[in-house]
Amino acid sequence: MSDEILNGAAAPADAAAAGPAFTIEKIYVKDVSFESPNAPAVFNDANQPELQLNLNQKVQRLNDNAFEVVLAVTLTCTAGGKTAYVAEVQQAGVFGLVGLDPQAIDVLLGTQCPNILFPYVRTLVSDLIQAGGFPPFYLQPINFEALYAESVRQRHNESASLADSEPAGNA
């Protein structure tokens, strides 16, 4: 039946016939960790906490039309030179991309997918920190479009410098 609906979306054959499509297939926690190696003494530390945030994104092609995107965040809090806590979250999603050119796929994977995953990361990091006995920390919005544009610039500069450093052919 060509009008059949699966989980609120058009059947796969219909989606391919309808043209380009971007779908969220699944969102899940891939890895999560919270450590507070100096608890409970750290709760009485009067030093100003220092926070360091590391953000990373990995993309893996699962098949012709599906990609796994993993948004990884590590938040480290130190106070008085001692680690108060380390919260690590890897939030992942499987995204369907059908009928799109490689450049459009690259843009979606680098901007829209992390934008979709980020609210899940923010909530999980905040919940972990509070469950560890610390005041909540709310990750501020991240401009993934700007990060993507910067990574494209870096890739372009690297490929240009590689082309410049290649030896000229023998004449």
Curated annotation (Swiss-Prot):
Record's keyword annotation contains Glycoprotein: no
Subcellular location: Cytoplasm
Disulfide bonds: none
Record-linked Pfam families: SecB (PF02556)
Keyword terms: Chaperone, Cytoplasm, Protein transport, Translocation, Transport
SUPFAM superfamilies: SecB-like (SSF54611)
Gene Ontology cellular component annotations, sorted alphabetically: cytoplasm
Bilayer-spanning residue ranges: none
A single MF term (Gene Ontology): unfolded protein binding
Single Gene Ontology BP annotation: protein tetramerization
Assembly and interaction partners: Homotetramer, a dimer of dimers. One homotetramer interacts with 1 SecA dimer.
Family under the similarity heading: Belongs to the SecB family.
NCBIfam families: PRK05751.1-2, PRK05751.1-4, secB
Protein task: One of the proteins required for the normal export of preproteins out of the cell cytoplasm. It is a molecular chaperone that binds to a subset of precursor proteins, maintaining them in a translocation-competent state. It also specifically binds to its receptor SecA.
Protein's UniProt name: Protein-export protein SecB
